[in-house]
C-alpha cells in the first residue's frame, strides 16, 4: 500500500511524522499522538489514542514507527477525506469563524503544530491556495487544497 506513494508524499509524511515524534526516537507513543491531536483541537481519550495506535501498530509493540505511519497515511489517502472532515479542519483553522483563513490564523495553527514558519513561508502557503487572490483562503479554496494532495 505504501509503495503507491510518490517520493514527495513520503517526504511530506516524514515531516509530519517528526512533528508527532516529539522526542525524536523514531516512534510515536499515545502521549505524543495525544499532544498533536489536542493541538488540532481534538480531545481524544486515552482509550481512543490506544485504538488509533493499535489500528496501525503492525508489530504490536504499542507505538507507531515510520513504516507503520506510512501505511496508515496511504490508507487514509485511499478513503479520501469526507466533506465532514474537511469542514471540521476548516473550522479549526478559521479561528474567528468569518469563513476565511487568514495568514495570521494559518501561522497560529502551524506554530501550534510545532512548525516554526517564516512569514514568507506562511504567505507562500496562502498564495498557493488563494485562487481568487484576496489574500486569504475561503472554504472552496481550502477544499481544493485538501483534495490536491
Swiss-Prot record:
One of its GO terms (molecular function) is calcium ion binding. The modification N-acetylalanine is found at residue 2. Ca(2+) 1 binds at residues 21, 23, 25, 27, 32. PROSITE patterns: EF_HAND_1, EF_HAND_2. Pfam families: EF-hand_7. Residues 8-43, 44-79, 81-116, 117-149 form the EF-hand domain. Belongs to the calmodulin family. This is Calmodulin. It comes from Macrocystis pyrifera.
